Amino acid sequence: MSKVIGIDLGTTNSAVAVMEGGESVIVPNSEGNRTTPSIVAFTKDGERLVGETAKRQAITNPDRTITSIKREMGTEYKVNIDGKDYTPEEISAMILQKLKADTESYLGEEVTEAVITVPAYFTDSQRQATKNAGKIAGLNVKRIINEPTAAALAYGIDKETDQHKVMVYDLGGGTFDVSILEVGDGVFEVLATRGNNRLGGDDFDEKLLNYLADEFMKQNGVDLRKDPTSKQRLKDAAENAKKELSTRVSTNVNLPFISAVNGTPVHLNMDITRSKFDELTSDLVEESLKPVRQALEDAGLSHNDIEKVLLVGGSTRIPAVQEAVKKLIGKNPQKDINPDECVAIGAALQGGVLTGEVKDLLLLDVTPLSLGIETLGGVCTKLIERNTTIPTKKSQVFTTAADGQTSVEIKVLQGEREMAADNTLLGQFNLTEIPAAPRGVPQIEVTFDIDANGIVNVSAKDLGSGKQQAMTITSSTKMSDDEIKRKVDEASKYAEEDKNKKETIETKNSAESVIYQVEKTIKDLGDKVSETEKSDINSKIEALKSILDSGDNKDIKAKTDELTQEMYKLSSKLYENNAQQPGASQEAKKDDDVVDADYEVVDDDENK
């Protein structure tokens, strides 16, 4: 059975893991790193860059570099590059394609199936968008699982037989989740989950960026945020300073030639202490504790009931974050696994469960938000409460609001507010051909069915006539199957283009190498190569050079082969020339004194 890989599609960094020999291992990317920046860039000549290469050129190409696209998943947001609109799903698919290709290179086999993680507090629209991104990238997404649950798997707490309660605090680059789980004997039951899809490491960077920009403006009267290149340099510096302050009490931000005042270059040079950084970001740390308190309340627990605290996400390296969690729960958080890698490791373990490679492990996750429909007066009537274990199915009977009503509009909502307008509209459909009757007489059964991915299916049935209508809630971006197929085809085309581009570069490099070797050999042989031979070879060299930039790999390879044959002839000439040198015969004479060893021919038949 083919491998089901585990992917942590992160806001700032992504990772991929796979089961090998019964263990979940991180797959290094083509650059040799264990995580890949979730960054996509388009160069001015149309080349598409993903990951490390995209990040390296961000300062010089900020307007065509896309970061933190995960925050826009499930929305109508578009990125316009050269007049073409890209959806968040498409950009995410480019990142997934890179992870897929790196894994295939690592394994030496094709990969088509994956488990992808999402923040526990992702809505149905965001989950569906993630699944669509996987489809565009050429992956069959076998399961969408919540990041905190995946992290809990990675910590290996399933190996403990005693039941105990665990809190997973997951602060990533762009999102925050907290989940309370009861685990033991291979069973993971999520009791409650809360979160904030707009809180993460990016916000900590932004606080420091704004402080640096404000201080610079006070001193020089220039707002660095108004220039894209200066802002990108400042952003990178803020991120690096944040990382350094996780292990040091102070750091220096030094950006020479960051701007100019009246034609004179000005530089930014500023010392930042950890205490200053903590002061700037204290409101963000406090903001992360609110969902923790809410999750404890939802689970009906106090902080004393929590036996283990797991920290997940790169932003949990911030000392103030660790201290705040420790102070609230009263326990030292576990830090015995890489917070950037544990989610992907857990996702691969879930992939192992699906293939049968990992046994005796059961995930019981929950839906993060309540689901319901709009009823008379614009009220949201909930059918499935938040923190209900999934998969789940719930039905409720409704009736008509007017005499003779022959159709009803079912508006599917997600959220905790009492009024429909204050919640997220996931989708709507009509149930028609209801027999006319006085209001209150028809019986319409509405059923919500949530699968293990957290994706919602809704149906409505008139119990009198048996008439039924159903729908699967799709992403709010409303990508149809045809649109997704078109995006898949485009992604495949790009993958083929990337492959062809690589082949073209390798073919050109090979040709240039042969040209160099031939020219060097001619030079080494000097006048031992006749002018006629030189002229013939040089004409072949020029013919090859003239088509190097044509992109015609077949022609380049053919002419390279011709030139290679000429190189072999020259090499033979070089060896012949060396053999005819006076020294060669002298060496032969010296060998006349060599004594031949005696030997006896043994007939094998005699020894049988």
Curated annotation (Swiss-Prot):
Induction text: By stress conditions e.g. heat shock.
Residue(s) carrying Phosphothreonine: T175
Disulfide bonding pattern of the chain: none
SUPFAM superfamilies: Actin-like ATPase domain, Heat shock protein 70kD (HSP70), C-terminal subdomain, Heat shock protein 70kD (HSP70), peptide-binding domain
Gene Ontology molecular functions: ATP binding; ATP-dependent protein folding chaperone; unfolded protein binding
NCBIfam families: PRK00290.1, prok_dnaK
Protein function: Acts as a chaperone.
HAMAP family: DnaK
UniProt protein name: Chaperone protein DnaK
